[in-house]
């Protein structure tokens, strides 16, 4: 994380250089989807995949509504999900995927009538506070983009098996509100206009001792099935830049491998 922020600095004096995408990354995703669709790519959202397997000479993707047959499948989901989706993988391969440790996140997004501490990012070391950082987006973007309100994020980074993932939104919201009031005693309930909780169990794989030996390979034991995910990012932070580098490198390797 420190390397990531230091790398975002500019010049020999390493002055701060920080930017944002107006409208959030949704704008980037929508623009990418439109460009792909314009090139003839068929995009299907809202089709949860239940099984990926091989039948005869083709790969099969099973959803709740249909089965799709194709030549090759590239899975970009987290390693434990790959193991769960692909019963044709060997037992050792599935176990290796399940063994990878992941860090997840639970995050509260708040709209407030007032600022909090005034800094863009405040790291928290007090174990009595139920989140690990206060990110005040309005210090970077400006409150005019939020109708005069202030946008803040309260992320909590936890292991993928942390009990917080079993708590409902109301419980997480109550705990985070209490923690925020502990940090900012003058904060009133009426200052919080809206609060929304989001969560993801598998955000990034945790590099452990001899991690590169455990890192999942792109090609699997199932012909036509490939894996490209964040567990293959090493010696770098899980940033947009590093993710794009992985995608570019993997695309080149896949095209070369499938052209043979």
Where are these regions (language model features)?
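Generic structural signal for well-ordered, non-membrane alpha-helical segments
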Residues: 21, 25, 29, 169, ...
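Internal hydrophobic alpha-helix adjacent to the cofactor/substrate pocket in enzyme cavities
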Residues: 243-260
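Charged, often glycine-rich, active-site loop that binds/positions anionic groups
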Residues: 202-214
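Short FAD-binding loop at a beta-strand-to-alpha-helix junction that anchors the flavin cofactor
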Residues: 151-155, 218-236, 242, 246
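Active-site/ligand-binding neighborhood in enzyme catalytic cores
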Residues: 1-51
């Amino acid at each position: 994380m420190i390397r990531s922020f230091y790398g975002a600095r500019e010049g020999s004096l390493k002055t701060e250089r920080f930017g944002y995408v107006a409208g959030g990354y949704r704008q980037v995703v929508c623009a990418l989807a439109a460009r792909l669709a314009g090139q003839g790519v068929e995009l299907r959202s809202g089709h949860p995949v239940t099984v990926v397997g091989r039948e005869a000479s083709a790969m099969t993707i099973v959803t709740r509504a249909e089965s799709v047959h194709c030549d090759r499948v590239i899975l970009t989901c987290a390693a434990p999900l790959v193991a769960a989706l692909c019963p044709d993988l060997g037992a050792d391969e599935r176990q290796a995927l399940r063994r990878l440790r992941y860090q997840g996140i639970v995050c509260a997004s708040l709209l407030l009538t007032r600022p909090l501490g005034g800094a863009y990012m405040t790291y928290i070391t007090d174990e009595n506070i139920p989140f690990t950082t206060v990110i005040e987006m309005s210090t970077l973007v400006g409150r005019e983009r939020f109708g005069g309100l202030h946008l803040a994020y309260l992320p909590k980074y936890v292991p993928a098996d942390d009990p917080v993932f079993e708590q409902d939104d109301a419980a997480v919201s109550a705990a985070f509100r209490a923690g925020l009031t502990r940090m900012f005693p003058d904060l009133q309930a009426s200052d919080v206009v809206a609060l929304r909780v989001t969560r993801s169990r598998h955000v990034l794989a945790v590099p452990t001792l001899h991690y590169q030996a455990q890192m999942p390979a792109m090609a699997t034991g199932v012909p036509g099935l490939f894996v490209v995910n964040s567990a293959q990012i090493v010696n770098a932070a899980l940033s947009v830049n590093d993710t794009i580098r992985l995608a570019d490198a993997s695309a080149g390797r896949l095209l070369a491998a499938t052209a043979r």
